[in-house]
Amino acid sequence: MKIDFDQIPLKHLPNFNGGEKEFAAHMLIDENSKILLGRLIPGASIGYHRHENSYEVIYFLSGCGKALYNADETGIENAVEERIAAGDCHYCPEGHFHSLINNGDDDLVFFAVVPLKK
């Protein structure tokens, strides 16, 4: 099935998961998964959160920033900081924590998939 993100309404999510500014995305959500084309403007972030019953795969299309990643509950201060840029892929396994931060000068644009457990 082809997904035309231009035909999916853009959702504006301020302070998503406790992040800064706004996360905007075209999201296709069905009973199996959440598939999205997302954008963080410079200075915006998706807050540090846990993937309790799912995992997430993110492929970066343009821009640069950083991902904070932690495999346990020791907190954001112990998270590993990973530089991300167009062409990189970030994986957050089930039960792990992560955050995305656009600390670059351009929009950080990415494609993400989060399978939903039944």
Label every PLM stretch briefly:
Residues N53-K66, N70-D72:
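Glycine- and acidic-residue-biased ligand/ion/polar-headgroup-sensing regions
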Residues G47-H49, A67-L68, C92, H98-G104:
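Short beta-strand His + acidic residue motifs that chelate non-heme Fe in jelly-roll/DSBH
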Residues D72-E94:
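Short acidic-glycine-tyrosine-enriched beta hairpin
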Residues A85-A86, E94-K118:
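Ligand-binding loop in jelly-roll beta-barrel domains
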Residues L36-N53:
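Conserved short histidine dyad/triad with adjacent acidic residue
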Residues M1-K34, G47, E81-A85:
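A short, N-terminal "cap"/entry segment at the start of jelly-roll beta-barrel domains
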Residues M27, I35-R39, V57, E81, ...:
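Conserved hydrophobic/aromatic beta-strand scaffold that supports enzyme active sites
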